[in-house]
């Protein structure tokens, strides 16, 4: 289930608000400039190639490309037995920005995006079918969990713009 928990810094042990209704979550995020959509997700076979997954969602990807000017897409897949899962998680957990929008569509599995907005931190747990667009230059971090198990499509304007610029600020998960 897609959920949004809102924390107030520095008291991050207990959320001050939790939402589970998708439309309420999308509306609140939109007020902060963050886009959340739900696409129909059909889990691909476990060993599906990136090409197979991109073909499966071609029409939706092309619609976004035309609407927003994105030019390319790829697939990221992390599993509990991925050789670099610990290092990747540590990297994702560092607050960073990108010089372009961060667009992710969860094909399978889930993960949590954290976006600090003023004195609050939004924790959005995305699941299969969720498309998230975090605007360019917005600080955020991502927790895929100790044993990540997700497949997501990443959509870019320029793959070089996806490179993270780390802020060095403290995060939590």
Swiss-Prot record:
SUPFAM superfamilies found in the cross-reference section: RmlC-like cupins
CDD domains per UniProt: cupin_ARD
Cofactor note: Binds 1 Fe(2+) cation per monomer.
Site feature (May play a role in transmitting local conformational changes) residues: 101
Keyword Heme on entry: no
Binding site for Ni(2+): 96, 98, 102, 140
E.C. numbers: 1.13.11.54, 1.13.11.53
Protein name from the UniProt record: Acireductone dioxygenase 1
Organism whose genome encodes this protein: Pectobacterium atrosepticum (strain SCRI 1043 / ATCC BAA-672)
Taxon lineage: Bacteria, Pseudomonadati, Pseudomonadota, Gammaproteobacteria, Enterobacterales
């Amino acid at each position: 289930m897609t959920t949004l928990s809102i924390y107030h810094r520095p008291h991050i042990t207990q959320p001050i608000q939790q939402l589970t209704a998708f439309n309420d979550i999308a509306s609140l995020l939109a007020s902060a400039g963050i886009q959340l959509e739900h696409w129909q997700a059909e889990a691909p076979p476990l060993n599906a190639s990136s090409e197979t997954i991109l073909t499966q969602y071609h029409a939706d990807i092309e619609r976004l490309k035309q609407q927003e000017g994105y030019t390319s897409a790829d697939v990221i897949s992390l599993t509990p037995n991925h050789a670099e899962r610990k290092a990747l998680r540590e990297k994702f957990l560092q607050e960073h920005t990108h010089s372009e929008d961060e667009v992710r569509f969860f094909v399978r599995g889930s993960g949590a995006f954290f976006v600090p907005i003023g004195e609050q931190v939004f924790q959005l747990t995305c699941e299969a079918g969720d498309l998230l667009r975090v605007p360019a230059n917005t600080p955020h971090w991502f927790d895929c969990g100790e044993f990540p198990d997700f497949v997501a499509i990443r959509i870019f304007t320029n793959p070089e713009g996806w490179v993270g610029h780390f802020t060095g600020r403290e995060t939590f998960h």
